[in-house]
Amino acid sequence: MPTVRRSRTLRATPEEIWAIVGDPHHLPRWWPRVARVEGVEEDAFTQVLTTAKGVPVGADFHVRESEAPHVRRWAQQLVNTPFERVLAESQVEVRLEPAGETGTRVAMALVQRVRGLAVLGSFMVRSAGRRQLDDALDGLEALVGR
């Protein structure tokens, strides 16, 4: 199962970063291609993503784990969606660990298990996943500083 991991140490406390990571409403500010977030509930939300051609696409997620200010994990709901043809599983995990007195190590993992013939392109999925996590860390860093 392709898993991509990225991490970075930011100059902000875990609580400061959690205020952003723990609230899906903030995703458009730091997560790549998210135009807006709708239907936010305690354990679910919908990301409205913008494709490269500018077309909005909705993606539903369930929060699988949330322990402030340490870990947040969410998984995409794939059944009966256009994503189901390509992905068997897609989930994101963000872990926050104190680093010194005022820093936080932000570790992200993206698990994407591809389906069927899409397995042949799994190296491309990993490459895109690395870009996505790097862009997410860049966005988070821009919000909290380094």
Predicted regions and their residues:
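A conserved amphipathic terminal alpha-helix motif
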Residues: 105, 111-146
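Hydrophobic-ligand-binding modules of eukaryotic lipid transfer/binding families
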Residues: 1-8, 15, 91, 99, ...
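Hydrophobic-ligand binding "helix-grip"
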Residues: 28-32, 36-39, 54-105, 111-113, ...
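Hydrophobic ligand-binding cavity/cleft-lining segments
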Residues: 1-42
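N-terminal glycine/threonine-rich, aromatic-flanked beta-hairpin/loop signature
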Residues: 45-47
